[in-house]
């Protein structure tokens, strides 16, 4: 695959429920601590190498940011790193929080 695909928050939730894709959150550490999709891996410059070492490049990856914009750059980066299928979640965490508040974890 040469580029990432877009995924609605509803589609992302279905992948999440079925555990058929990895969910990564690229927001800043404070935002992630305040609340994130349950089970989301916090993907930062500091955690990127570990993520790449541990990842199965054949498993789809869903990238979540604040509103669905900055996730696009991260999604394209993961495609360039060799991931087979990568999605950017439209609406990002704000849409996830609005639609699926029961699927949020806070570290505070």
Swiss-Prot record:
Residues 17-105 form the Rhodanese domain. It comes from the Bacteria. Keywords: Cytoplasm, Transferase. GO terms for biological process: glycerol metabolic process. Its EC number is 2.8.1.1. One of its GO terms (cellular component) is cytoplasm. It holds the Pfam family Rhodanese. It is found in: Cytoplasm. The active site is at 65 (cysteine persulfide intermediate). One of its GO terms (molecular function) is thiosulfate-cyanide sulfurtransferase activity. It catalyses: thiosulfate + hydrogen cyanide = thiocyanate + sulfite + 2 H(+); thiosulfate + [thioredoxin]-dithiol = [thioredoxin]-disulfide + hydrogen sulfide + sulfite + 2 H(+). NCBIfam families: PRK00162.1. Transferase that catalyzes the transfer of sulfur from thiosulfate to thiophilic acceptors such as cyanide or dithiols. May function in a CysM-independent thiosulfate assimilation pathway by catalyzing the conversion of thiosulfate to sulfite, which can then be used for L-cysteine biosynthesis. Belongs to the GlpE family. This is Thiosulfate sulfurtransferase GlpE. It comes from Proteus mirabilis (strain HI4320).
